[in-house]
Amino acid sequence: MDERRSSIFSTNIPCRNEQLYGRCPYIDKGCFFQHKNQDNAPASSKPPSATAIDPQNSGFSTKLSINSPSFTPLKLSKTSISSASNKESVPLTRPKSYSSALSSGKNGAAAQQAANSPKTVSLMTSSSKAANALQTHKSSLARAASAVPFSPSKATTVSLKESASLTSLSNNKSVSNLNSISGASSPSGSLVNLHSLTRSASFVPQPSVPNSGQLSNADMSRHILARFPPFFHNLNEQQQKTTSFFLADDHLKWFTYLTQEFYQFANIPKLPSHVLSYHSLIPRRMIVTVLPVLRYATSIYKVIDGNNGLPYSFVQLRDFTLLNDRNITNVSPWTKVDSPHVIKIREAFTTHAFEQKSIVFVYNYLPSCPSLYDLFFASPVFRKRTSSFYFSQPLKATKEVLWCFASQLISALYSIHSSGLAAKMVSLKNVLMVGKMRLAIFGLGIMDVIQEESTEPLTSLQRNDCRDVGLILLALATDTENVTLSTAKAHLTRLKTIVSTDASLVELIEVLIFNEELRIQTLLPTMLSYMVNNYESVLLMEDVYETYLAEQVENDRLLRLLLKLEFLDDRPEYVDDPDWSASGVYFVIRLFRKYMFQVQTIDDASKKPTLQSTTTPPRKLLNKAHLLSCLNKLDAGTDEQILLEDEFTRIIMSFKEVKTTINTAFMELERRCSNNLSVKK
């Protein structure tokens, strides 16, 4: 017979046919359940190797009833009985509760006699201590199984999934060691003998912990005040110096300035209301003209694209006539240049919207960033003004600064030359500092449109770009504004006489200016170490910005909770709503809001916050930490109990219950708004 259809534990279960009808018609046909006249049963029904079981430990506390369904038992498997007899037999103490429960039934005398007889039981473990614990804690699986109609073909085994579901239905408690038992009692681990589970000493139901399942999965870091330690605490002195090299000294002031620039709007009557899809034109206040070599009157505006709502920069050349319409298509290759050191152009077009012939170049938006000329060669007042966002003191052209500028400008030229283009315009006035120690070239692509097509080869134009970068570095190193190719040798000779000058930097400037066969690709190996330093500094700065970003994420999370509470607070349609009355389900939201924003009092003697006044006039305290703690615990939905009260009501609830109530009320509000309902229906 199949092992699943036989079990030695079935021999100690009273036969229900005998209880219902007085005799069992299958007693001579191999019925392996217990009968009153067991001696009259055939030998096949009483295998000598089978051990008896104490009925008290069977775990079936349900009384026998006349309404129990009848059954048709199957034959006992000799193979399973003989294999089970080899297991260790441990005597169990006989509790009284089960025998007394059986004695109250119709067959109480027989059950009492069977309970008083000495019996042994086959167990899966030899721990007698665990067996005693089993007598105290009744098996929840057995109680669940006793409530299910009996079927002989399914009485001995149940699947792991079924046993877990039965336990959940019976007492709604979690059985944490069910998987370990299934592996011990079933070779495959997929089937569990239900009756052996109820008698196994290793299976002891654990005491139920309230919401233990939720506690194991809850994000416990969300109910505390979310704080991120300053990143600089984890850096040594050298790393702090490297990071601050690229990080603005007053970053909050810089971020505020960027936000003000972004949201700045003005209505200027002399400007057109819109140009194509661009609108909201605002002149950019530049200290000096950033495009001085164009020989045209230039105006720069901040505009908003009506198609996507993003800001862009307008460069307008006034009184310009495009002689060759095909030249405007020269902007297309520049739209494909992607480099952090090149301000990308978007498009170019001619227009009469400014009441005169003009050509407009549209670039990606950037704030009013200073140029290198503003930082090093403008008047002291302008220099202090332009560098105030990045530096606490005016910037000086030290060796580290010059190498940083050189690596960025050479990287920009490498991206441009690799695209088959030439910058044609690199000067102190169109190289902008868009961040602390971060440079970007502005206005590229304009010369390709306004100039006639040149017969000069591309390699010669690219060589001029390298020369322009060398002149910029030489001007910064010698603190000389007007450095040209004719005066470069004299300035370079004077630079070599300075003791603090880096010899490798002088060699780089000399190669950039005077080497006629120079290609930008040949300079990259010499700049590799400085580019790696810049890369490491940028990564450290990225960690700092991530710290700031994490703080703003926490602020955003708490702001959303506050907004949700404010949407639900004191709405006029809730005045006559019974759910929001003092006896309604949503009244707890009002009590919780009062609990969060309560004004605590401080006893001068103990210096501890209290909610009751003392003999002396109490000191009021706006406890913001209490507010943040409540919001974090509400977001996490913790099980911490709090007292919500007013003059007439006192309610003890957990943050989890309050969170569920708030979410339900807010979803109901959203439903009414989506259905355009003023009151709840």
UniProtKB/Swiss-Prot annotation:
It comes from the Eukaryota. InterPro entries: Kinase-like_dom_sf, PAN3, Pan3_PK. Residues 38-58, 82-123 are annotated as: Disordered. Residues 96-106 have a biased composition (Polar residues). The lineage of its organism: Eukaryota, Fungi, Dikarya, Ascomycota, Taphrinomycotina. Coiled coil: none annotated. GO terms for cellular component: cytosol; P-body; PAN complex. Its main location: cytoplasm. One of its GO terms (biological process) is nuclear-transcribed mRNA poly(A) tail shortening. This is PAB-dependent poly(A)-specific ribonuclease subunit pan3-like. It holds the Pfam family Pan3_PK. Regulatory subunit of the poly(A)-nuclease (PAN) deadenylation complex. It is found in: Cytoplasm. The keyword Cytoplasm applies.
